[in-house]
UniProtKB/Swiss-Prot annotation:
<keyword id="KW-0217">Developmental protein</keyword>
<dbReference type="GO" id="GO:0006412">
    <property type="term" value="P:translation"/>
</dbReference>
<dbReference type="GO" id="GO:1990403">
    <property type="term" value="P:embryonic brain development"/>
</dbReference>
<dbReference type="InterPro" id="IPR047873">
    <property type="entry name" value="Ribosomal_uL16"/>
</dbReference>
<dbReference type="GO" id="GO:0022625">
    <property type="term" value="C:cytosolic large ribosomal subunit"/>
</dbReference>
<keyword id="KW-0689">Ribosomal protein</keyword>
<keyword id="KW-0687">Ribonucleoprotein</keyword>
<dbReference type="GO" id="GO:0045182">
    <property type="term" value="F:translation regulator activity"/>
</dbReference>
<dbReference type="Pfam" id="PF00252">
    <property type="entry name" value="Ribosomal_L16"/>
</dbReference>
<dbReference type="InterPro" id="IPR018255">
    <property type="entry name" value="Ribosomal_uL16_CS_euk_arc"/>
</dbReference>
<comment type="function">
    <text>Component of the large ribosomal subunit. Plays a role in the formation of actively translating ribosomes.</text>
</comment>
<keyword id="KW-0963">Cytoplasm</keyword>
<protein>
    <recommendedName>
        <fullName>Large ribosomal subunit protein uL16</fullName>
    </recommendedName>
</protein>
<dbReference type="InterPro" id="IPR036920">
    <property type="entry name" value="Ribosomal_uL16_sf"/>
</dbReference>
<dbReference type="GO" id="GO:0003735">
    <property type="term" value="F:structural constituent of ribosome"/>
</dbReference>
<dbReference type="GO" id="GO:0006417">
    <property type="term" value="P:regulation of translation"/>
</dbReference>
<comment type="similarity">
    <text>Belongs to the universal ribosomal protein uL16 family.</text>
</comment>
């Protein structure tokens, strides 16, 4: 509901003081071909939040399913990797009111109004990435459309942004292949290892001899 959209309270995570929290609806945060090597999927699209708000775990789950369905249909089930970048750790509460007649015994109104845990939400800042998709460069339109469809599951305003970075790495796409060729980056699964320009010379020689 609308009242759970705004970040009014301090973060209230599940802890030994906050017990009996229902499980978050979203359980899977990575979909598609998540084992794909870093050089297979150079293009990366982000959905970026434009508001400081809370997104429920139900909304995250709905958006994840929606984006996944469209990407599977358009790019094949092995043609992409979606990652949900938010995790719902903040617990929201509800002060249960009994509305039926004859509920005089439990109807306390605002006496003892600290609520019981109802569900979990993720707190998102302005400019924070909600969801990312990496895929091949020719699938750019599909990425934008998948994120556009997933946007309808969230309150507030989101922007879709095609990243300048290579896949899910932090290195710019135009310099990425050159850095790999110079062995300044070593592909490692869906990420890369950065080789700094300092350290023992024999390690550098061993790397370049390989």
């Amino acid at each position: 509901p609308r009242c759970y959209r705004y970040c009014k309270n301090k973060p209230y995570p599940k802890s030994r003081f906050c017990r009996g929290v229902p499980d978050p609806k979203i359980r899977i945060f990575d979909l598609g071909r998540k084992k794909a090597k870093v050089d297979e999927f150079p293009l990366c699209g982000h959905m970026v939040s434009d508001e400081y708000e809370q997104l429920s775990s139900e909304a995250l789950e709905a958006a994840r399913i929606c984006a996944n369905k469209y990407m599977v249909k358009s790019c094949g089930k092995d043609g992409f990797h979606i990652r949900v970048r938010l995790h719902p750790f903040h617990v929201i509460r509800i002060n249960k009111m009994l509305s039926c007649a004859g509920a005089d015994r439990l109807q306390t109104g605002m006496r003892g109004a600290f609520g019981k845990p109802q569900g979990t939400v993720a707190r998102v800042h302005m400019g924070q990435v909600i969801m990312s998709i990496r895929t091949k460069a020719q699938n750019k339109e599909h990425v934008v459309e998948a994120l556009r469809r997933a946007k309808f599951k969230f309150p507030g305003r989101q922007k879709i942004h095609i990243s300048k970075k290579w896949g899910f790495t932090k290195f710019n796409a135009d310099a990425f292949e050159e850095m790999v060729a110079q062995k300044r980056l070593i592909p490692d699964g869906c990420g890369v290892k950065y080789v700094p320009g300092r350290g023992p010379l024999d390690r550098w020689r061993a790397l370049h001899a390989a």
